[in-house]
């Protein structure tokens, strides 16, 4: 039974009502060689080579799939540099000097409505694979693998819930590109031969609700409907969203496709629209840069590969207190990763950068055994027991506590009265459990 949900402090008002600033022409762009799912990669270009926007310039390798690396602007490859990736690790990045011509690779082409209507699921699978489309809500799971399912799909769910505090990138995307999202939903319905889709948002998003009710009315397509879910965290977790939207409760580890459901994030839908309509990979995305450490929190639409340093001073006004130590979080405060500096590159799956003044008074205290972490866990784990097992290096105990069920929602750390980063201990436990 999914019942352990909670209200968390909402800080979206900092930027939620602000339109996204377009910043698409930085002097240099940086493309990650590897990522969390693809630890190895080959480079197809050498220093001094000219590249086109959307050109395949390398190939990432995972255990069971390969993933093309695309240039996100036209220009000259000038070398390799190390920067922080969204996983919090220093990673090799391909550095491209922008020529500001935005010359597109010949592979980019606009398909006619007739050509799109003729595409099969197999055709679309190949397109999204070649465009390296992944889950853009942060999961980075290859979209083409979802398209390869042989299970019959009778419901497509679009996740526009964005339950993390601070982040409003998807909110702005939904308001600014609604027609692209609706068209992409139709492409997915065509691929899966599915006649029902729901766009899931939080019930408090009145502006999105108004926009989509009008658009769906104009489209006159009753196969797609809006689904307003409760204002809880972690309502964006696919298990909770599916339960709320369909009444179906997935078993632990069960894939949604086993129940005839396929779910996508709204950002992934815009990526699907670009891939199907223009044969174009993801070269731009919406992000939120916010937090109490900067003067002007903003939403942006940027090229993938942009350094946040290019945005902080010019658009965000710099730091409010430059002399203070900062906390930099890639992603949301609940599930994101911290990095030690602002040397951060925006990759395809970066949804936000949160910059906070470090609070040195927020010191971890001994556990008081209050049970808050246990009560708040949406998958019914015992985080405090997992933490104690990790501290004792008791691998057998760790495995019995089943930390692999953890979805890393961060509620155990959020609710901890002793300010213990319980989620970090559970992450370590997951590593031990896999050994």
Language-model region placement:
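Hydrophobic alpha-helical positions that pack around
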Residues: 195-308, 314-320, 332
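Acidic low-complexity segments
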Residues: 79, 84-141, 150, 206
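Short, well-structured beta-strand-loop connectors
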Residues: 46-59, 78-79
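Histidine-anchored nucleotide/phosphate-binding helix
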Residues: 175-192
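N-terminal, Lys/Arg-enriched amphipathic/low-complexity engagement segments
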Residues: 1-44, 95
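Gly-rich Lys/Arg/Thr-decorated short loops/hinges at beta-loop-alpha junctions or inter-strand turns
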Residues: 104, 156-170, 293
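Ferredoxin-type iron-sulfur electron-transfer modules in oxidoreductases and energy-metabolism complexes
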Residues: 351-364, 374, 378-435
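Extended boundary segments
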Residues: 1-22, 79, 84-85, 249-252, ...
């Amino acid at each position: 039974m999914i019942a352990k949900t909670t209200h968390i402090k909402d800080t979206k008002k900092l930027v939620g009502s602000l339109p996204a600033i377009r910043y698409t022409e930085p002097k240099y762009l940086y493309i990650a060689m590897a990522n969390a799912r693809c630890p190895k990669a080959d480079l197809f270009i050498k220093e001094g080579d000219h590249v086109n926007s959307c050109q395949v310039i390398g190939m990432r390798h995972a255990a069971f799939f390969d993933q093309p690396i695309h240039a996100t602007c036209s220009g000259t490859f000038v070398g390799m540099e190390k920067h922080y990736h969204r996983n919090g690790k220093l990673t090799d990045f391909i550095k491209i000097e922008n020529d500001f011509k935005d010359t597109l690779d010949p592979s980019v082409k606009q398909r006619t409505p007739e050509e799109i209507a003729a595409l099969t699921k197999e055709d679309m699978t190949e397109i999204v694979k070649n465009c390296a489309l992944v889950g853009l809500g942060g999961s980075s799971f290859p979209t083409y693998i979802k398209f390869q399912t042989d299970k019959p799909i009778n419901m497509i769910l679009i996740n526009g819930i964005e339950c993390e505090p601070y982040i409003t990138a998807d909110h702005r995307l939904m308001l600014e590109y609604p027609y692209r999202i609706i068209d992409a939903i139709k492409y997915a319905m065509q691929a899966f031969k599915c006649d029902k889709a729901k766009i899931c948002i939080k019930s408090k998003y009145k502006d999105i609700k108004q926009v989509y009710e009008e658009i769906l009315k104009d489209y006159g397509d009753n196969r797609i409907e809006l689904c307003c879910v409760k204002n809880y965290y972690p309502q964006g977790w696919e298990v909770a969203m599916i339960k709320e939207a369909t009444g179906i409760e997935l078993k632990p580890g069960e894939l949604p496709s086993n129940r005839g459901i396929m779910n996508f994030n709204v950002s992934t839908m815009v990526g699907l629209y670009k891939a199907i309509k223009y044969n174009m990979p993801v070269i731009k995305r919406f992000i939120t840069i916010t937090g109490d450490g900067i003067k002007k929190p903003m939403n942006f639409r940027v090229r993938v590969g942009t350094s946040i340093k290019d945005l902080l001073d010019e658009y965000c006004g710099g730091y409010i207190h430059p002399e203070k130590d900062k906390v930099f979080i890639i992603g949301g405060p609940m599930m994101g990763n911290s990095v030690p500096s602002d040397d951060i590159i925006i990759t395809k799956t970066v949804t936000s950068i949160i910059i906070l003044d470090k609070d040195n008074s927020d010191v971890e205290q001994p556990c008081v055994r209050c049970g808050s972490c246990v009560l708040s866990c949406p998958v019914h784990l015992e985080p405090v027991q997992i933490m104690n097992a990790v501290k004792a290096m008791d691998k057998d105990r760790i495995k019995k506590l089943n930390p692999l069920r953890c979805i890393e929602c961060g509620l155990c750390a959020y609710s901890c009265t002793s300010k213990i980063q319980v989620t970090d201990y559970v992450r370590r436990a997951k590593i031990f459990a896999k050994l």
